[in-house]
C-alpha cells in the first residue's frame, strides 16, 4: 500500500447509538442527575465487515452527592480507527438546582486525551516523517447545561472546548475540533404498561455537515424496550434492551441505507448498573 497524505488528521468524537442511555459521555451536566450511583460500559464495532473499522469502548460512572445537589463522575473512552487510537480519561462535576417539577444542572469536565498512531504495513515514499509512529497527550475541558423534568430533558454541551494541534514532520496538524451537541427527549405514556420516548441529538463541528440522530423507543412494563433510529436518514438501526433489577443490558444493530450493507453493519452492546447507596438517593426508581 502506498500513501502520500497525512496519517493523522482532525478526529471526530466517537459515535454513540445509545447516547440516551449514557448521556454523560456527551454532556457533563448529566452527572448525578438521577439521584443515584450509576455505572455503565459499552462497546461499539462499526463497519464490522471491514478490517480496521472503527471500534469504541467506553466507561462512565457518576453519583449524586450532598443531598443530590451535586454530581461527580468519571469517563474513560478508547476510540480506534485502523492504526489511529485516541484514549480519553476525565472527571465530571455538576451542580443541580431543583425546582418543584424541573431540575437545572450545570456541568463541567476536565481530563486528558492521548492521540497515538502506529502505521504498520504501509509503504511510504521517501520515508515521510508524517507517517512515523506518533503519541501525544493533550489536556481538554468541557461544559454542559441540562433542563430535566419528570417527562422531558433538554441539554446543550461542548464536551471538549479546546481545539488540539500537534507538530509532525515540521508541520502543524489540527487533530481535534470542538463538537457542539443539542439533546432532547420526551416520555409519552400510551397506557399503564406502554411508554413511548422519542429522542433527538444534533451534533455540529466545523468543517462537517450537521449530524442529526432521531430515536423512537417503546418500553413495556418499564422493563423491556424496542426502538428504531436513523442518523442523517442514511443510517438505520434497531435497539433492544431489558432491565433486570438494578441492571440494564442493551444491544443496537445498524445498517447504512445505501452501499454494501452487509460489509458496513455496526454492533453496539451496553451494560449499566444503578444503585441507591446513600440515604438521600432515590429509592423508588432505578433512573433507567
Task: Go through each PLM region and give its residues.
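N-terminal signal peptide c-region/cleavage motif recognized by signal peptidases
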Residues: 4-5
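Subset of outer-membrane beta-barrel
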Residues: 11-288
Amino acid at each position: 500500500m502506498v500513501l502520500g497524505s497525512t496519517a493523522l488528521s482532525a478526529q471526530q468524537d466517537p459515535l454513540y447509538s445509545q447516547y440516551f442511555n449514557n448521556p454523560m459521555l456527551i454532556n457533563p451536566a448529566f452527572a448525578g442527575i438521577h439521584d443515584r450511583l450509576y455505572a455503565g460500559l459499552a462497546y461499539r464495532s462499526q463497519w464490522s465487515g471491514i478490517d480496521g473499522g472503527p471500534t469504541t469502548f467506553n466507561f462512565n460512572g457518576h453519583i449524586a452527592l450532598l443531598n443530590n445537589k451535586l454530581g461527580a463522575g468519571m469517563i474513560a473512552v478508547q476510540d480506534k480507527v485502523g492504526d489511529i487510537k485516541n484514549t480519553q480519561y476525565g472527571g465530571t462535576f455538576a451542580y443541580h438546582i431543583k425546582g418543584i417539577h424541573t431540575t437545572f444542572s450545570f456541568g463541567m469536565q476536565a481530563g486528558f486525551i492521548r492521540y497515538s498512531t502506529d502505521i504498520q504495513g504501509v509503504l511510504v515514499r521517501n520515508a515521510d516523517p508524517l507517517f512515523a509512529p506518533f503519541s501525544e497527550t493533550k489536556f481538554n475541558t468541557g461544559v454542559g447545561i441540562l433542563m430535566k423534568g419528570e417527562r422531558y430533558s433538554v441539554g446543550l454541551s461542548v464536551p471538549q472546548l479546546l481545539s488540539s494541534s500537534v507538530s509532525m514532520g515540521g508541520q502543524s496538524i489540527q487533530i481535534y475540533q470542538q463538537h457542539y451537541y443539542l439533546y432532547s427527549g420526551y416520555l409519552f405514556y400510551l397506557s399503564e404498561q406502554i411508554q413511548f420516548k422519542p429522542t433527538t441529538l444534533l451534533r455540529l463541528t466545523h468543517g462537517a455537515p450537521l449530524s442529526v440522530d432521531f430515536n423512537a423507543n417503546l418500553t413495556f412494563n418499564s422493563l423491556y424496550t424496542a426502538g428504531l433510529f436513523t442518523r442523517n436518514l442514511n443510517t438505520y438501526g434497531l435497539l433492544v434492551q431489558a432491565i433486570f433489577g438494578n441492571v440494564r443490558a442493551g444491544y443496537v444493530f445498524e445498517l447504512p441505507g445505501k452501499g454494501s450493507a452487509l460489509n458496513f453493519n455496526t454492533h453496539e452492546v451496553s451494560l449499566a448498573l444503578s444503585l441507591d447507596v446513600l440515604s438521600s438517593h432515590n429509592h423508588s426508581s432505578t433512573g433507567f
